[in-house]
């Protein structure tokens, strides 16, 4: 059953400045968040708190279907991807 959800949530990386390992971790955390929560704010909060805990502060996360962005981020700490119809922007600042 869990593999069915993961199959539906195939990540599509749109823009990235992040190691392969961290990209994979970001996708895995996002999948966990989307399995636990259905409200975009709650999904973003889960991802942000997980990355703050695992990788150190300060991470920012935006989750949604229709938004524009232009951000400054630490080198090697940025990813923008889709899981299903939901866009996820995750980045770290100093």
Curated annotation (Swiss-Prot):
GO terms for biological process: conidium formation; establishment of mitotic spindle localization; mRNA transport; nuclear migration along microtubule; nuclear pore complex assembly; protein transport; sexual sporulation resulting in formation of a cellular spore. Its main location: cytoplasm. Keywords: Cytoplasm, Cytoskeleton, Dynein, Microtubule, Motor protein, mRNA transport, Nuclear pore complex, Nucleus, Protein transport, Translocation, Transport. PROSITE patterns: DYNEIN_LIGHT_1 (PS01239). One of its GO terms (cellular component) is cytoplasmic microtubule. It comes from the Eukaryota. SUPFAM superfamilies: DLC. GO terms for molecular function: dynein intermediate chain binding; plus-end-directed microtubule motor activity. It holds the Pfam family Dynein_light. InterPro entries: DLC_sf (IPR037177), Dynein_light_1/2_CS (IPR019763), Dynein_light_chain_typ-1/2 (IPR001372). It is found in: Cytoplasm, Cytoskeleton; Nucleus, Nuclear pore complex. Homodimer. Cytoplasmic dynein consists of two catalytic heavy chains (HCs) and a number of non-catalytic subunits which present intermediate chains (ICs), light intermediate chains (LICs) and light chains (LCs). Component of the nuclear pore complex (NPC). The nuclear pore complex constitutes the exclusive means of nucleocytoplasmic transport. Belongs to the dynein light chain family. Acts as one of several non-catalytic accessory components of the cytoplasmic dynein complex that are thought to be involved in linking dynein to cargos and to adapter proteins that regulate dynein function. Cytoplasmic dynein 1 acts as a motor for the intracellular retrograde motility of vesicles and organelles along microtubules. May play a role in changing or maintaining the spatial distribution of cytoskeletal structures. Also a component of the nuclear pore complex. This is Dynein light chain, cytoplasmic. The gene is nudG.
């Amino acid at each position: 059953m869990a593999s069915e959800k993961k199959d539906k949530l195939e990540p599509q990386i749109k823009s990235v400045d992040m190691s392969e390992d961290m990209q994979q971790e970001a996708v895995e955390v996002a999948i966990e968040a989307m399995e636990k929560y259905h409200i975009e704010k709650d999904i973003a909060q889960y991802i942000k708190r997980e990355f703050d805990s695992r990788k150190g502060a300060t991470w920012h996360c935006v989750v949604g279907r229709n938004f524009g962005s232009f951000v400054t981020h630490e080198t090697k700490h940025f990813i923008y991807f889709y899981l299903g119809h939901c866009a996820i922007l995750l980045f770290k600042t100093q």
